[in-house]
Structures are given as C-alpha cells and as structure tokens.
Amino acid sequence: MDTDASLLLGVEHEQKQQEELYQQLLLQTMGKLQSDSPPSKVIRPQPGLCVKTSSVSDKKKVFLNICQSQTVPPPPHLSQEALVELLESEDPTSYRVPMSLGEPHTEVDNSSQGCTVYDVVINDEFFQKCEKDTLFQQFLIAVSLEGLENKYSLELSRDIKILKNRKFMGSIAEQNIRTKSKPIIQEIDSKESLTLPSAAKRPEFTLLVEPPSGKAEHLIAEILLPGVSSARSLVLDLGEDRLVLIARPSLFHLDIFFPVLIDQENSVAQYNTNTQTLTVTMPVVSL
C-alpha cells in the first residue's frame, strides 16, 4: 500500500513544532530567571573560625576560613531539636544554609609549608548561633565541606581540627555575592525548605565534556526525568558554576555545582518527551 508522503511530512512537522515549543517554553523560563537575577556586591567578610582538614587524594593540608557577613542571608530558623531530627533523616541536605564559596588560594602555614585555603562566608547571626552551640557548629562545618566538594570536585577528610588561636589562615579575600537570594533557591519558608527536597527525588544525570580530550568547549548535562510529560513543569536555573532544576509538583530536585565556569546566556536546553531526558548544553568560559 502506498503511503501519502504529505501525511508523513505533516506529522513530522507537527512533532518538530511541538519540540520547538517545549524548548521555547523552557528557555523562556531560563531567561526569566536570569533576567530576574538580583544585583551583587563586593564584600570583605569578617573572620570567624579556621578549620584544618586535608585532601583525601594527596593528603595535603587544606584550611577552611569560615567567615561571616550580614550581607549573606540567614537560613530558615531551626531549633536544636529540629536539627537533631534533620540529621537523623534520610536527606539532611534538605535544609539549606546560604553561603558563598570562594576560590582556592595558596597560603603558608605555621610550619612554612604551602597549603590550600578556601573562604566560606555565611550570615553573621547564624555564625554566632553556631559558635555558641557545638551541634550547630559541627553541622556548619559538614555543610561547608560538602559545598566545597560539590563545587570543586574535591574529596576532603572528615578528620578535622578547629584552630583555637587563629580565626583565619592567610588572608581573607573579597567576594562578589548576591545582595538578595533568588526565589527558586532561598525565598521559601522553613516548612517548605524541610519538605520539598524530601518529597522530590534527585534524578539520575550525567555530565559530559565536549570534546572528550583537549580543551573543553562545552559541558553537557543529560538529566533523566521519568514521569515528566512536558517541559512546562520544569523550572531550570543556571548560574556561572551551578545548575538548579525543579520538576513540579515535587517530582525531582537537582542542585549541582560544575568544576568549570559556563556561559549562561548562550546555553541551550532541550527536553525530549519520548526519552524523558533533559539535555542542557553549556559553553565553557575560557579562563
């Protein structure tokens, strides 16, 4: 039986239009989030405490300068009882502590040996709370280590030491931070911040570098979203080194840092409804 080519072309055209619509809606969401990006300012954080640890791979010394600033927004209120309950839950990362993670810098320790130092900046009131409560202090150090590991693809030892006689190692660099948090990440009440990620699953994903060898030109994220029938339910936010994805209603939640800086404005997202895979192609910024 002969097949009407015009019918096939019509179906293909309709599918192509639908895919383009999905992509346009997703990119409109990305563009709105980027255009709504709050202003940023350069701050010089105040000293707080200094934590000594080491890199698991080469055993070299690493120091964390946990600093404080009133410019960084505080996390939602959390009592000690709620913190204990949170730490015993399946997903302690559901409670977010806003923080600015600085670039690594090389310093010289008391033994005249070179070491790597990271500056972590948190809200000053929350820092004072952690300073008075050992459990909160341990929690703060844990989330700081995890944040650095995610952002810089590190593995840091949990065998730590808080230095008693110094509040920072080397010098504390200025940092460029947002003056107001993005709604998708920070402006949620304490109840939502504790329930959203536990209800939403972390999707499976892969990160690919193109080309596979040589200088990286593109970073490609492929995120599997089974059960998501349309891009309309996706909220995607790209930062210079971060990807945040929410699939409504509370289906998936992904928040990852990249080991490289990306060009948000020229990034492209496509959602394939057949494979239920979101592909985000991001140009790598040359340093």
UniProtKB/Swiss-Prot annotation:
Gene Ontology CC annotations of this record: cytoplasm; nucleus; R2TP complex; ribonucleoprotein complex
Primary location class: nucleus
Gene Ontology annotations of biological process type: axonemal dynein complex assembly; box C/D snoRNP assembly; rRNA processing
Keywords: Nucleus, Transcription, Transcription regulation
Family, per entry: Belongs to the PIH1 family.
Biological function: Involved in the assembly of C/D box small nucleolar ribonucleoprotein (snoRNP) particles. Recruits the SWI/SNF complex to the core promoter of rRNA genes and enhances pre-rRNA transcription. Mediates interaction of TELO2 with the R2TP complex which is necessary for the stability of MTOR and SMG1. Positively regulates the assembly and activity of the mTORC1 complex.
Descriptive protein name: PIH1 domain-containing protein 1
Lineage, opening ranks: Eukaryota, Metazoa, Chordata, Craniata, Vertebrata
